């Protein structure tokens, strides 16, 4: 097992090899010291937000193959000065050295004076400014960027400081020196708010008729950022599009927010309530007068009830706008608002109840509160895991290091293009695909279990199996073979394999494989009348089967296609116990990988051995570490007496011809039908141009990965099925887009472009056809 260790600044990354999942953190620190030359006591290791502490293993932190651990180097503490050095330093200061530095320290204020000057800014009342007391204005909020109706209650200006000269230029007050005290009409409970002059303007009150609206005009309109079809706040809007049909009027604009940011191409729903912005000094603002009633608020009677559950019915209990426990509205002074979910809770409804309001500024309800006992602080040990305590490895008395096997490292990716119970080929995995380890076969979805030979369910059938020669009764003839069922072996103590010790039974995986036979299940065995009508089984051959079969690969694992169960029966095996035997025959249109046609196809598709990410780099580092002691022995006096050591090879070495010799890859060519379909898909012409460049540079598998990446649905994060190409040239699954429309969201999931939901969505048939050819059966389970 190997992992990546990267410094916190990201400038240096190294691979650490020869690890196990049972490697202690303190042992990992020693290996990191060899690579980074950092002492263990100066290392701070972080993985997934946790600081790794000594005493734990990589398995405790769930560190997997090729994962990255971050290294933060502690600063080494400076040692205290010796008595002699301290005396010499004191004598230097006494003799006058460093006097200039000490004097400058005495005279320096380090910016404290500037901070005090800002705190001493004095404001005084004034009658200056564009807007006076009691005038009705619009005030822009610093959070939303929306404009709210308010009234000026006080105007202040910045007073002159003692340092400023009392000249005509200094006395002249700019608008930036004016601060307005306002109170909001809609939110009187907020009290008085102090705002700058640039966020205040005369209240908008003139409605612009539809026929007077023009593109490029800046107006004030109502818009809801979260729910575009509902009433929201008032924003400045620059009109970008105007359209009128026989039955509807459509107005689109760019919503202006804070700091010059904006929301583009948003549809304005309330086209009859577009207001003209009152520019300064053009018209006098409205002034509060006893003889005139105050102006009507813009949202009065239009926004509807604030609570959509109880419709603001005071006599109806509600758990949304009232107490979340009892739903009562009484005693509002004894209600607490959660700072996370904004729900209200009575003090006496909590468990346990509270006698008074807590003095803390923030309070969280029991559902939102984080249990501090479950939080692992920096420097603390991990909490005990109940799940890991029940594992066989935790209760075993064996001292064997089981963490070095590739079957224990865990999957880094998972096949999601088809469900786990998928019968038949995996889309995008042709016959002849090779992997070095079983965990890679699991990641591809061809055979998901890491160790088990059969993948299936006793009530559904078997989906795949691995022919690895684990049973002496197996007979492999290439296009057909006799397979031995599972079970009958004592695997207690976390064993991987053992000898036959009891009879096998037609249960679990054995029954699942029997269900693939086209005949009723029978406890005594059965034979299919038409074996081709049976359920397909994906077959993977492992290199360990080479001791019994000439069809096994020389290295790793190889996918050999689809087989069908012809018959199954029980018999006494070579071990003397009852075993279940299965006869499987090949039923695949793709050629066998051991034939000449299969080898030509493998070469045409560019199928080569696939290694885990970082495996070859880790192997190269291992080779270098082996060569170093070998050179030391050759240079020593006893080098001539050393014998030849034989080591078992675990993979391709740098000096082996298998690693150095590169086979010539033939570029994959699309069929004439596929090329015509790509030309017909004009909406995705740019995407196809980028994808087709990979045909010249890499093998068939790279081309398929590029297609997956280019045509991935942004909603379900899978390859698009029944794709809909939008006007903005994004591809979304039809089911995902229909689900979005049912939720009243009519914008593109990728770019928020407003989509036309009045007409039915149409599937891009050319794109769907070519995806079905490249990934046959990928729509299974969708």
From Swiss-Prot:
Binding site for DNA: 468-469, 474
Region ranges (Linker): 293-306
Effect of residue 148 to A: Abolishes binding to histone H3K9me3 and ability to repress transcription of target genes
Domain YDG: 424-586
Region (Required for formation of a 5-methylcytosine-binding pocket), start-end ranges: 471-474, 483-486
The protein, known as: E3 ubiquitin-protein ligase UHRF1
Phenotype of null mutants: Mice display a sensitization to DNA damage and replication block, and die in mid-gestation.
Source species of the chain: Mus musculus (Mouse)
GO cellular component: chromatin; cytosol; euchromatin; heterochromatin; nuclear matrix; nucleoplasm; nucleus; replication fork
Zn finger residue spans: RING-type: 713-752
Post-translational modification: Phosphorylation at Ser-303 of the linker region decreases the binding to H3K9me3. Phosphorylation at Ser-639 by CDK1 during M phase impairs interaction with USP7, preventing deubiquitination and leading to degradation by the proteasome. Ubiquitinated; which leads to proteasomal degradation. Autoubiquitinated; interaction with USP7 leads to deubiquitination and prevents degradation. Ubiquitination and degradation takes place during M phase, when phosphorylation at Ser-639 prevents interaction with USP7 and subsequent deubiquitination. Polyubiquitination may be stimulated by DNA damage.
Pathway membership: Protein modification; protein ubiquitination
Entry remark concerning the domains of this protein: The tudor-like regions specifically recognize and bind histone H3 unmethylated at 'Arg-2' (H3R2me0), while the PHD-type zinc finger specifically recognizes and binds histone H3 trimethylated at 'Lys-9' (H3K9me3). The tudor-like regions simultaneously recognizes H3K9me3 through a conserved aromatic cage in the first tudor-like subdomain and unmodified H3K4 (H3K4me0) within a groove between the tandem subdomains. The YDG domain (also named SRA domain) specifically recognizes and binds hemimethylated DNA at replication forks (DNA that is only methylated on the mother strand of replicating DNA). The YDG domain contains a binding pocket that accommodates the 5-methylcytosine that is flipped out of the duplex DNA. 2 specialized loops reach through the resulting gap in the DNA from both the major and the minor grooves to read the other 3 bases of the CpG duplex.
């Amino acid at each position: 097992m190997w992992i990546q260790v990267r410094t916190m600044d990201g400038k240096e990354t190294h691979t650490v090899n020869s690890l196990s999942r049972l490697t202690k953190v303190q042992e990992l620190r020693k290996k990191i010291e060899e690579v980074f030359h950092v002492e263990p006591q100066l290392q701070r290791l972080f993985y997934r937000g946790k600081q790794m502490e000594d005493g734990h293993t990589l398995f405790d932190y769930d560190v997997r193959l090729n994962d990255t651990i971050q290294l933060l180097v502690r600063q080494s503490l400076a040692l205290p000065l010796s008595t002699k050095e301290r005396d010499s330093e004191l004598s230097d200061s006494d003799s006058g050295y460093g006097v200039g530095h000490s004097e400058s320290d005495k005279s320096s204020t380090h910016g404290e004076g500037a901070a005090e000057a800002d705190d001493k800014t004095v404001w005084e009342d004034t009658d200056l400014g564009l807007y006076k007391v009691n005038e009705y204005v619009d005030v822009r909020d610093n959070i939303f960027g929306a404009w709210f109706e308010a009234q000026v209650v006080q105007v202040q200006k910045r007073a002159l400081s003692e340092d400023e000269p009392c000249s005509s230029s200094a006395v002249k007050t700019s608008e930036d020196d004016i601060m307005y005290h306002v109170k909001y009409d809609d939110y009187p409970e907020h009290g008085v708010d102090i705002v700058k002059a640039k966020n205040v303007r005369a209240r908008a009150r003139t409605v612009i008729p539809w026929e007077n609206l023009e593109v490029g005009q800046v107006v004030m309109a109502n818009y809801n950022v979260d729910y575009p079809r509902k009433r929201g706040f008032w924003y400045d809007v620059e009109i970008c599009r105007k359209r009128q049909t026989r039955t509807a009027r459509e107005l689109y604009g760019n919503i202006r927010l804070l700091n010059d940011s904006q929301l583009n191409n948003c549809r304005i729903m309330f086209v009859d309530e577009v207001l003209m912005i009152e520019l300064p000094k053009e018209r006098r603002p409205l002034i509060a007068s006893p003889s005139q009633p105050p102006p009507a608020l813009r949202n009065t009677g239009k926004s509807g009830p604030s609570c959509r559950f109880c419709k603001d019915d005071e006599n109806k209990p509600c758990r949304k706008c009232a107490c979340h426990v009892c739903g009562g509205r009484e005693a509002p002074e004894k209600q607490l608002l959660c700072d996370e979910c904004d729900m209200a809770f009575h003090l006496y409804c909590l468990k346990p109840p509270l006698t008074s309001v807590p003095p803390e500024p923030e309070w969280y309800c029991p559902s939102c509160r984080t249990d501090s006992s479950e939080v692992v602080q920096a420097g603390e040990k991990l909490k005990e895991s109940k799940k890991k305590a029940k594992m066989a490895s935790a209760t075993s008395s064996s001292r064997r290091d089981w963490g070095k096997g590739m079957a224990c490292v865990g999957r880094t990716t998972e096949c999601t293009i088809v469900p786990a119970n998928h019968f038949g080929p995996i889309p995008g995995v042709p016959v002849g695909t090779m992997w070095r380890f079983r965990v890679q076969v699991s990641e591809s979805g061809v055979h998901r279990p890491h160790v088990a030979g059969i993948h299936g369910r006793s009530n559904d059938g078997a989906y795949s199996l691995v022919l690895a020669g684990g049973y002496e009764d197996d007979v492999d003839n290439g296009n057909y073979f006799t397979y031995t069922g599972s079970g009958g072996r004592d695997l207690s103590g976390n064993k991987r394999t053992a000898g036959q010790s009891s009879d096998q039974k037609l249960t679990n995986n054995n029954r699942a494989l029997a269900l693939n036979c086209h005949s009723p299940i029978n406890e005594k065995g059965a034979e299919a009348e038409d074996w081709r009508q049976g359920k397909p089984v994906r077959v993977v051959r492992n290199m360990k089967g080479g001791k019994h079969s000439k069809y096994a690969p020389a290295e790793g694992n190889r996918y050999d296609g689809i087989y069908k169960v012809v018959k199954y029966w029980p018999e006494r095996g070579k071990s003397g116990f009852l075993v279940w035997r299965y006869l499987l025959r090949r039923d695949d249109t793709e050629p066998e990988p051991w034939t000449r046609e299969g080898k030509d196809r493998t070469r045409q598709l560019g199928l080569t051995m696939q290694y885990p990410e970082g495996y070859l780099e880790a192997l190269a580092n291992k080779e270098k570490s082996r060569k170093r002691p070998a050179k030391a022995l050759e240079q020593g006096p006893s080098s001539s007496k050393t014998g030849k050591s034989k080591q078992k090879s675990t993979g391709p070495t740098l000096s082996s011809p298998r690693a150095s010799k590169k086979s010539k890859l033939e570029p994959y060519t699309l069929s004439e039908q596929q090329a015509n379909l790509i030309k017909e898909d004009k909406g995705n012409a740019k995407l196809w141009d980028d994808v087709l460049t990979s045909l010249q540079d890499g093998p068939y598998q790279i081309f398929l990965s590029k297609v997956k990446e280019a045509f991935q649905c942004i909603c379900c994060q899978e390859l698009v099925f029944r794709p809909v190409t939008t006007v903005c040239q994004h591809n979304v699954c039809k089911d995902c887009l229909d689900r979005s429309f049912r939720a009243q969201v009519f914008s593109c999931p990728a770019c928020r472009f407003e989509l036309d939901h009045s007409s039915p969505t149409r599937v891009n048939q050319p794109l769907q056809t070519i995806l079905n050819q490249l990934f046959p059966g990928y729509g299974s389970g969708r």
